[in-house]
Every structure is written in C-alpha cells, then in structure tokens.
UniProtKB/Swiss-Prot annotation:
EC number(s) reported in the record: 3.1.1.96
Pfam families according to UniProt: Tyr_Deacylase (PF02580)
HAMAP family with a match to the protein in the record: Deacylase_Dtd
Localization, UniProt: Cytoplasm
GO biological process, one term: D-amino acid catabolic process
Segments carrying motif Gly-cisPro motif, important for rejection of L-amino acids: 136-137
InterPro entries in alphabetical order: Daa-tRNA_deacyls_DTD, DTD-like_sf
Function: An aminoacyl-tRNA editing enzyme that deacylates mischarged D-aminoacyl-tRNAs. Also deacylates mischarged glycyl-tRNA(Ala), protecting cells against glycine mischarging by AlaRS. Acts via tRNA-based rather than protein-based catalysis; rejects L-amino acids rather than detecting D-amino acids in the active site. By recycling D-aminoacyl-tRNA to D-amino acids and free tRNA molecules, this enzyme counteracts the toxicity associated with the formation of D-aminoacyl-tRNA entities in vivo and helps enforce protein L-homochirality.
Entry domain remark: A Gly-cisPro motif from one monomer fits into the active site of the other monomer to allow specific chiral rejection of L-amino acids.
NCBIfam families tied to this protein: D-aminoacyl-tRNA deacylase
GO cellular component, one term: cytoplasm
Record-given protein name: D-aminoacyl-tRNA deacylase
Subunit structure: Homodimer.
C-alpha cells in the first residue's frame, strides 16, 4: 500500500457537489492499493497510522497520536499513487491493484482503522473533490513495502 497522510484542521470529500465525508482535526489519508498487498500490509499501515505521533502536545512538540487527540480520519482511495512516469508524458497505472482487490482491501483497511478512531470516507472509484485545511503542514508518505 502507498499512503499519503496529511495532518488537517478539517477536510471533506464531495461527489457531484454532495459531501460524502467530512472531519475536523485529524488525518486525511490518500490510499493506494497495490496488487501484492495483503492482510499484513493492512495491519502494518493501521498500526503506524493510529500510533504515529505527529500531533503537537502542550509544548508544541509532535508527541501525540491521532488517538491521543481524539481526532478523526478521512480516507480517500487514490490509485494514482501507483503512477509510473518513466516513459512519455502520460502516466501508466498498471502498478495499482485491480479494482475488485483494491476495493476489498480498501474497505477492510477502513474497517480496521475504525476500531481505533472515527473514519469518514469517499466512495471507491468515484470522481471526488477533496477540500482540506493543512495543519503545519505535516505530510507523510507511507509505503507498506518499505519497512
């Protein structure tokens, strides 16, 4: 899995002008699923995300997790994280998982996250508009195959 984590003051995702999900303080996750991803990748990503200390404590030090601050997650599927830009000017997305597998793993990922923190989400495969107010900004790239 490839994920982009953005610390946000607020974020929302809309489809056809209607809000599908919205959060206040927490994390916006852009989630890409690869063809070799499995339950171990999901567990690793969930564990890292819910425990990562990227929120400020009273002293302004990044020392608190999303659980500590009682934050929420907005999860948005994002197959374009697997873009291959080596040849030409048009990216190829053949490195992303096929939609059936990606949808199943994305759903499972969100269900596992929801065991720890509230999770709002977009609609898998939909054309979505994402709005956010970055906090920091703090943006982290997480690749479950690089640990």
């Amino acid at each position: 899995m490839k994920l982009v984590l953005q610390r946000v003051k607020e974020a929302s995702v809309s489809i056809d002008g209607k809000i599908a999900g919205a959060i206040n303080q927490g994390l916006l996750l852009l989630v890409g699923v690869g063809p070799d991803d499995n339950a171990e990748d999901l567990a690793y990503a969930v564990r890292k995300i819910v425990n990562m200390r990227i929120f400020s404590d009273a002293d302004g030090k990044m020392n608190q997790s999303i659980q500590d601050i009682k934050g929420s997650i907005l999860s948005v599927s994002q197959f374009t994280l697997y873009a291959d830009t080596k040849k030409g000017n048009r990216p190829a997305f053949t490195g992303a998982a096929k939609p059936d597998l990606a949808s199943q793993l994305y759903d499972s990922f969100n269900e596992q996250l929801a065991e720890f923190v509230p999770v709002e989400r977009g609609v898998f495969g939909a054309d979505m508009q994402v709005s956010l107010i970055n906090d920091g900004p703090v943006t982290i790239i997480l690749d479950t195959k690089c640990h």
